[in-house]
């Protein structure tokens, strides 16, 4: 049954209930909805814009929980609908739909849980589900079938595809490059690792966790003596490690920019939460790169390429919605965004079209933890597997595999299903528990990972990889009873963390979770049999593989390419047009004022922000670095900055890498680094159109080698990073737009005194000459 409430602003709040509500309960809901009045009709006429019926919004999840906390029972779903004049009104088809009247069926999804399917034809299933499995991987799965003596289930094939996607396993970076007929001596990953091997400096953990950790200073920790109950606060000294991480969410942001960027920010925060046995995020960064937004007439440079029939969103919509999404998540979670960049670019030469039609959205940040907890523990048989966070929904299915290929290759339905939704409040609750456990004298966490691509199957298998584990599916929270076993196992719903905890500590952790209102579920245990399985209540296992079958033998990737020399015409300038050139340059999004990005995001929450973007009396966004303090009374802190040069990289990929590092370093130089360059570590995030055209793979190799060599010569390390190597957009008419090969470098390190950061504000000093 659905009740309709009309708010004072004329929107309609639809409330699904499992039973008839007492008049007192209806009055409570009316008060909760801002003195809304309940409609007596079961059906409402008119046109309304509201959420898609199959996607329960985060707003609904939180609203339903509020009703539960008020003592109301039987409320299942709450959504808001906005009246419009007619069906021609604009709305976002990714998240919303047009309703020609509201009735009792608006939440009905005519889907029954699909049964477990044993896959008879891997090739057909691969294409149908958009799994992006290679021929070699399918051959490998056929071998696994032979070893098992049975056909693989849809859950096993789907899960394997996500776990072993390029997005998750970075096969190109670990693969062998053969360029101009010659096998290269080192893989891309080996060249990046070389920087830390030769110059470890202060690095404690690199390349093996969700984040990189560098040795930090001793600072004060201000926290309750006991987090499981009301207690007094104490101050104690802790030996810290500094975390650095940057993540990209390019495909989801291209398809649905608000949730794509929002979940990108959320995922990067969870990466820092999931470092070691848990750590604390403190401040974020963001980068947006799109094609020209074409916001005004008369911007001649934007005519270099004709306007495309954009697959999902226009560049202007992406810039607005993506920055809204990243800002929204940080604001709701309580993480300030203190450093960032924006770039728009298109170019055409020799018949090749370059533009960020497949956009770049980078979410990065810095944080810290205790040196005690910076390395993960080793699981022992009988450890409990805990999931913390929200329910399972049909959201974010196949994101790992779909984001590993050109956007536009698969149907819009598959690509939309791969986009997650954001619920920052749920993530904050889970974080509060992790924070509490890390602040205690004895942290009970053995290991921790976040739920990202592939959901439970990826996260929980990583927790038990050394030992094997069994997950009881009836213990997992199900928000949508129509989910199949495959969808339960692999969805990316909401914000969730997987923890491995000693059995003796479960009760204590549950007390903390209850205080923080963080949903916590003990869903399984380590088994010691080197297998990983999901088991239904009836004993059927839709997923049951040996751990080494999941991780150990994915075929090696070979990248065969040849060097292609590309020549670009020299640009000619006329001195008589200097003023016109300046006028144009000042209009570029990369140059013009960024207050439309900074003014909508919290840049000071936590009380530890020493330097954010906006400076001077009128708070212009001028600062090139962000700086945070590590406690409330000390001077020690962390600085972070960014650098990129994709335009230069088009002409010379090696120069692009060097300039990206140089920009990050010249941006961070305004903060007093504790030990100079030895304090600085870099994250390198590579966005490249691999296999898009001849010569691109060779260009990537050149770019990575140049960055490695340059960092080694400067004696600095690159202990973390990420790659997104399918930066191509395909259109139904066959047109292919290639994103320029791009490396974004994030710098971070310890600051000796956060009060001595040089400001970009010029001061009129009468004593100066």
Task: List PLM regions with ranges.
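A structural-propensity feature for long, helix-poor, extended segments
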Residues: 483-488, 493-496
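Flexible beta->alpha loop and helix N-cap segments adjacent to enzyme active/binding sites
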Residues: 762-769
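C-terminal substrate/ligand-recognition segments
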Residues: 648-649, 653-657, 661, 668-671
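Short, conserved secondary-structure segments in the cores of folded domains
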Residues: 375, 758-759
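Core nucleic-acid recognition elements
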Residues: 1-407, 412-426, 430, 434-442, ...
